[in-house]
Regions:
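ATP-dependent carboxylate-amine ligase
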Residues: 7, 11-16, 23-36, 40-200
């Protein structure tokens, strides 16, 4: 089975899910699973809202290519960002095409991270998103309202070679996602780093 046949890899573009599939296949094989069963499991698994909420769920809304993923640290965001830019590059031209398709991100993380890790998340986000909407988790884990958002914004401003042209802070996760969708044009890619999956 080639990785582009595995729906969770989005044609092999989601490299982290290629690695996840390899690990799952190896573990299953080590436990005695037959190869045809492993193949069926990997090719039949769809990263839908029902089967794996917050794990690279793809949702198209009025021509906007939306994804929801946790990606709550810089390493996870880098993997997500690389996937998103690869996905963006692979989109076919259509009547909805715009001069420059954008990558829009709703970015947030938990408050129990170190300040430098939250700042690094902001720097990483600026590498991949043209527009960033900064949000906060409802459960701030010991932080003051707006504190995590301020650290993310600091990181975004520290990225000298970033893509970001616009940054907005909307603390409420659902409102941030709605605002991001209102900014998006058909053909844009929108990623929401979600926390409250039921609310989204």
């Amino acid at each position: 089975t080639y990785c582009d046949r595995l729906p969770a890899t989005y044609g092999g573009k989601a490299r982290f899910n290629v690695m996840n599939a390899m690990a799952a296949a190896g573990a299953a094989f080590a436990q005695g699973a037959h190869l045809h069963d492993i193949r069926a499991g990997l090719t039949g698994f769809l990263p839908t809202w029902d089967s794996a909420p917050g794990r690279l769920n793809h949702i198209d809304v009025n021509g906007v290519h939306g994804f929801v993923d946790y990606a709550h640290n810089a390493a996870g965001l880098r993997a997500l960002g690389e996937f998103l830019l690869s996905y963006l590059d692979g989109l076919t031209k259509s009547s909805h095409d715009i001069a420059r398709r954008r990558c829009i991100g709703v970015v947030g993380t938990a408050g129990d991270r170190r300040d430098e890790d939250i700042i690094d998340l902001g720097r990483t986000a600026a590498e991949f998103f043209d527009v960033i909407i900064i949000r906060e988790d409802k459960k701030r884990r010991g932080r003051e309202v707006g504190e995590v958002a301020g650290l993310i914004a600091e990181g975004v401003s520290q990225q000298p070679n970033g893509r970001t042209r616009q940054t907005v802070t909307i603390l409420d996760e659902v409102e941030a996602a709605r605002h991001a969708l209102s900014l998006a044009n058909p053909g844009d890619v929108l990623a929401v780093m979600g926390d409250d999956m039921q609310a989204l």
